[in-house]
Amino acid sequence: MMIPWQDLAPETLDSLIESFVLREGTDYGEHERSLEQKVADVKRQLQNGEILLVWSELHETVNIMPRNQFRG
């Protein structure tokens, strides 16, 4: 189920994004990016509709995924 990120309290959204960024461990190439930069990147992608917040009823977790991978 898709979660409208705009409906979340800003602190909740930040916590979800930080948790996602910290567990992803994505390689950003030669230059490491700060947590704040990574969070800002994810927020921008949410605002642009490139990615979605998704609730998994099976796992009872929230995840962030590319829009084109969501099958709801």
Curated annotation (Swiss-Prot):
InterPro entries: UPF0270, YehU-like_sf. It holds the Pfam family UPF0270. It comes from the Bacteria. Gene3D superfamilies: YehU-like. HAMAP family: UPF0270. Belongs to the UPF0270 family. This is UPF0270 protein Ent638_3781. It comes from Enterobacter sp. (strain 638).
